Amino acid sequence: GAVGTTLATISAIKPALNAEELDSWVAIQADGSVVAYYGKVDLGQGLDVAIGQIVAEELDVSYRKVKIVMGNSATSLNQGGASSALGIQGGAKPLRNASAEARRILLNLASEKLNVPVANLSIFDGVISVKGNDAQKVSYAELIGGKYFNSKVEWNKRIGNPLDVKGVAKPKSQSEYKVVGLSLPRNDVAWKVYGTEGNIADVRVPGMLHARVIRTPVAGGLAEKVDESSIKHIKGARVVREKNFLAVVAEREWDAVKAAKELKVTWVANSKPF
């Protein structure tokens, strides 16, 4: 549907991944929980918690009902890097706007189903009810659970960090916040403390070697002569050279470290370093 479409657009088929598709940003599961697709990865800032709070806030669901899918190129758009403040300062905007738009559509769907104006509806934890009559209600799961909005949002035609989208709905003001600003426990603390989760340094593959790059001591310097015999005493260590790229590899990381320190290289200045 077009930007701003509210009714009769629900589909059982998910639209293709596209920044203009609301379904590329947020989904309501069959059980009423929420999945948000975040096109960045966490670099230790706890972005999954922060983004989860923002999505929960705009959709009026509890934080525990939100799952953040991060950096999966099959399901998430390219939002660029997440270093420093980029994860939230820019990266949260599309999800905030998309979640607000999803909430608007859900309210309109509930209005049609309950035959009550949107102004007379309220939301609590994913359940929309008539103000003053909590018995007259409908949940997100009943409205759209497991299906798709099939609705458009306005995309600024940028990719990476500048990417942004917006719908008709206006996100909440700070005075309305109930979830954003809460101090919630981070999901990564326990596995960092107890070492239960794998890190890149723990990866092992068959035939794997460890390497160290040998760098010139001066800008643009060239390796004129490399004495490979200087590291023969280090088990399994050998030189890798491709034009002016120089490195050492070994089966054990410490052996690669030692080889990098002990490899004798004669460097010469480059008349045109850059």
Report each predicted region and the residues it spans.
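Cofactor-binding beta-sheet edge motifs in enzyme active sites
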Residues: 2-274
